[in-house]
Amino acid sequence: MKNYTTGVLSVIILGVLFAGNADKPAYNALKGFEPLIGEWAGESESIGIFEGLPNEGAKKTINLSTYRWLLDKTSVQREWKTLEADGKTVINIGTTIYTLDPVTKNIVSTSFGYDGPVYWTGHGRAIVNEKNYIFNIEEVTINGTYTEYTIQLNIDGENKMKWELINVIQNQKKIPDAPKRVLERK
């Protein structure tokens, strides 16, 4: 009887320990975003590439990015803003929401924003492997410019983020990758 009681008690304890994660599939899928949560900032040169942006290298920029949890950790929001070096003039702004697609079990994204005066929307898919992130994205502007690209993002230590925009195809034409950017946690 003692063995039976111990066995039942073990099953109950293990059930309680692991049940906490089983009922949070969105968080379980997105918990790899935890190292990104917070505010990030860096300086670079303009990347060009997207309709409405200054040409590559034409301007010094300040890059701001904030990641936060939404709705009881069921999604992650990224907001970004690129400013001219004066810290006042906005070059581009945008928001991305990352969620778990319950059908495919993939992390998917929906994005929108402005590059200069040009409005755009997009969607994509994220792959998270520890502190390495790959975002495959498709976007279209209000003017019909279609762009697909990949962002590779790596967290280096606790406070440094490196990202680059690669494999850019715009209206079925391959264009050069953007220079790597480095942001630091604020």
Say what each PLM segment does.
Residues 1-4:
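Positively charged n-region of N-terminal signal peptides that target proteins for export
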Residues 20-186:
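Hydrophobic small-molecule pocket/channel-lining residues, especially in calycin-type beta-barrels
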Residues 7-16:
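Bacterial N-terminal signal peptides
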